[in-house]
Amino acid sequence: MTNPAPIEAPLPKGVTDFLPEKADKIGYIEGKIRRVFELWGFRRIITPLLEFQDVMAAGLGEDLKERTFRFDDRQTGKLLAIPSDITPQVARIVATRMRGCPLPHRLYYIGRVLRHVELQSGRSRETFQAGVELIGLDSPEADAEMVAMAVEILKGLGFEEFKVDLGHTGFIRGVMAASGLGGDARRRLQEAVGKKDSSAVRAILETEPVADRIKEELAALPRLFGGREVLAEAARVATSDSSRRALDNIAQVLDILDIHGVSDHLTLDLGEIRGLDYHSGLTFEGFVTGIGEAVCSGGRYDNLTQRYGYPAPATGFAFNILALLNALEKRPDVEASKTRDLLIFNLKDDRREALEIAQHLRALGYSTARDIIHRDFNDSLDYARRMNILRMMVIGGDYCAADEAYVVRVADKRGTAVKKADLMRNDFSLNTLP
């Protein structure tokens, strides 16, 4: 009997299926992140997959508003939205459901969002996010905590070559306000600064009525990138009080991060313009060597919950799980695949003993599968290897005595006999086997 030909079942562009091996790696990454979030005292929150469009849009920046998927609700006729970011959902929940709870709120989430993208770019419409929101604290220590957590997670995932770039929207806003530029000139200037294009910045300033002192400050922006010494150069050219306050804030955060012991992984980028319509203070992005996109990003957003009627200072950040997956897959020395403990290979006609042993081992916490398909020893061993199972247990046959089971280490086919009575003890451990 031949198998029927598979039907065509294409997916829309920008989404993908994750088969067990990659799904295991995603689960591994999420587990590592979740563990750190909880060690720092954050509690999980789960947000819905649908929001009313007007409610969702209240918490989004202009870019994400344009990239949100929208459609009509057949029940109400209102416009619904699939969330393009989880942070506004958390802000809404805190403002409407948790305003009577004591501050600060330490909340974390793990979920997926959907965004319109240019499909020619090959980018994914789906983003897997894992993030935290610290709501109710306006202090350098709160900002530093976000950065320190991000560094701890990246280290915990086995990365050594990575940097976290710090910026500050207050500094950029102060500089831009001092220029007196508006409209298209300001937009072009911000774009040139964001690209670190010094020649474009100078060309724009040559055609605009900006004071020489301010021109010096603006021309310096693309160069304000590096270590802590950047603060001194920025202070030398800063002309506005708001920019100077931002520099003081960054210095305070850096002092606390030095106590956390993460300074070696930090750089300053005071020409960073990301999030000017959303963030209200310190911002940061994390980059792993060899990966072009940021693996995490975040910052302060003191005005977000106010959009839902509840003014509260807040900061947070999120990891892009698929970017982390991409980075891990470039590191063969980092083991991110999930292993299973045991495959039971039963050669007896009676399945009762095999089922009882499997049930007992699961109760002890060992992942245990039964090879129900009838095949020979080598085929079952090959199946275990391909399924990333560490050991195979043979029950029955001539591999050992009748009161024993034969446990084979899949990696090297090394086997050992184990008394079945020992297997059924409550203190039995697979780790004691060779």
Curated annotation (Swiss-Prot):
**Family matches, as CDD domains:** HisRS-like_core
The extra comment attached to this record reads: This function is generally fulfilled by the C-terminal part of HisG, which is missing in some bacteria such as this one.
Q: Where in the cell is it found?
A: Cytoplasm
Q: Where is it mainly found? A: cytoplasm
Q: PROSITE patterns from the xrefs?
A: AA_TRNA_LIGASE_II
One example of a Gene Ontology biological process annotation: L-histidine biosynthetic process
Quaternary structure (record): Heteromultimer composed of HisG and HisZ subunits.
Describe the family membership recorded for this protein in Swiss-Prot or TrEMBL. Belongs to the class-II aminoacyl-tRNA synthetase family. HisZ subfamily.
User: What does this chain do?
Assistant: Required for the first step of histidine biosynthesis. May allow the feedback regulation of ATP phosphoribosyltransferase activity by histidine.
Protein name (Swiss-Prot/TrEMBL):
ATP phosphoribosyltransferase regulatory subunit
Q: Name one GO cellular component term.
A: cytoplasm
Which species expresses this protein natively?
Geobacter metallireducens (strain ATCC 53774 / DSM 7210 / GS-15)
Keywords, A to Z, come to: Amino-acid biosynthesis, Cytoplasm, Histidine biosynthesis
Pathways per UniProt: Amino-acid biosynthesis; L-histidine biosynthesis; L-histidine from 5-phospho-alpha-D-ribose 1-diphosphate: step 1/9
Q: Which residues form a coiled coil?
A: none
**InterPro entries xrefs:** aa-tRNA-synth_II, aa-tRNA-synth_II/BPL/LPL, HisRS-like_core, HisRS/HisZ, HisZ
